[in-house]
């Protein structure tokens, strides 16, 4: 008599998990308003971590170091000493902005 030894295996291979494969969402940091751009009071100028750019005239700093305009005007980025920068907002007539 003929004996058969039949052995069945799984047709899906077991796969181990990886410890990689995760990342945090981008925080969308950076300059939001360009030099010479007209802004309204409350507009965000720069989103940053730490004070890479310091607040200048008519610019406030939020709790997360975000710089924002305190008045309507034109944005100006300036040097503050040798290695620092500051953002300022200077008032301007609305007619001058519309003419441009």
UniProtKB/Swiss-Prot annotation:
| Taxonomic lineage | Bacteria, Bacillati, Bacillota, Clostridia, Eubacteriales
The record's listing under PANTHER family reads: LARGE RIBOSOMAL SUBUNIT PROTEIN BL27M, RIBOSOMAL PROTEIN L27
Q: What is this protein called?
A: Large ribosomal subunit protein bL27
One molecular function GO term is: structural constituent of ribosome
Q: Which GO terms describe its cellular component?
A: cytosolic large ribosomal subunit
Query: Pro-segment residues?
Result: 1-9
Record PTM: The N-terminus is cleaved by ribosomal processing cysteine protease Prp.
Q: Name one GO biological process term.
A: translation
Q: Which family does it belong to?
A: Belongs to the bacterial ribosomal protein bL27 family.
Instruction: Tell me the organism.
Output: Clostridium perfringens (strain 13 / Type A)
Q: Which residues form the signal peptide?
A: none
Q: Which UniProt keywords apply?
A: Ribonucleoprotein, Ribosomal protein
For this protein, the record's InterPro entries field holds: Ribosomal_bL27, Ribosomal_bL27_CS
